[in-house]
């Protein structure tokens, strides 16, 4: 099973300019909370690159201080942190927010959904951004594309999986609607942030997990 094109979203508070950012002599500093361990290749470094690009595009007038998971808020609470003004920006994945609205899942990895190119085309040219804006408006937020991992791999397991019968009762780390799909096969979905996955596998708290793919997984110790 493959999941398609995880779009990492930069969530921006629509009232961010009024959320008490640090201001000095016409310069502003915003806070960006993320769901990723500090310096994590791909996802974490992507957030840092986004922050650097924003500073460059603003001519240095706006700087972004990037917070890794847990530094300012827990990894899976970026959405709420931006909504309540703790931070002006967040960098994470939409399927972490399905507790706020099931529609959030459609703006990140979705089982048997868009390819990377299809997702980008839908957001930019197929009214996807309009729907995203409408979905986040009640929370005072706006979502934007901020990168893509491409097609993702299925998982890592503590024991060999030979058939569907081996999935029965398997505690498997996966967020979003992919967890619902696997639940139909007898899997028990568990939501965990990236930094907690490997320790949970080591301890036996979970039986399997998915993250992204070879490049990103290697950084978390999956190989």
Predicted regions and their residues:
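N-terminal secretory/targeting leader peptides
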Residues: 2-119, 127-223
């Amino acid at each position: 099973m493959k999941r398609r094109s995880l779009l990492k979203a930069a969530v921006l508070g629509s009232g961010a300019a009024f959320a008490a950012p640090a201001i000095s002599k016409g310069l502003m500093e915003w806070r960006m909370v993320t769901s990723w361990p500090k310096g994590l290749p791909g996802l974490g470094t992507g957030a840092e690159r986004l922050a650097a690009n924003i500073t460059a595009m603003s001519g240095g007038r706006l700087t972004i201080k990037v917070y890794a998971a847990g530094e300012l808020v827990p990894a899976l609470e970026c959405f709420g942190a931006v909504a309540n003004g703790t931070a002006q920006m967040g960098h994470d994945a939409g399927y972490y927010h399905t507790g706020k609205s099931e529609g959030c899942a459609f703006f990140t990895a979705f089982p048997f959904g868009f390819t990377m190119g299809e997702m980008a085309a839908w957001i930019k040219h197929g009214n996807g951004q309009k729907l995203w804006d409408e979905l986040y408006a009640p929370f005072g937020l706006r979502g934007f594309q901020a990168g893509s991992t491409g097609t993702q791999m299925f998982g890592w397991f503590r024991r060999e999986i030979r058939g569907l019968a081996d999935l029965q009762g398997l505690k498997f780390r996966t967020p979003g609607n992919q967890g619902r799909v696997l639940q139909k096969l007898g899997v028990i979905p568990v939501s965990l942030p990236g930094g907690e996955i490997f320790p949970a596998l080591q301890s036996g708290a979970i039986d399997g997990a998915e993250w992204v793919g070879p490049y990103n997984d290697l950084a978390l110790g999956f190989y």
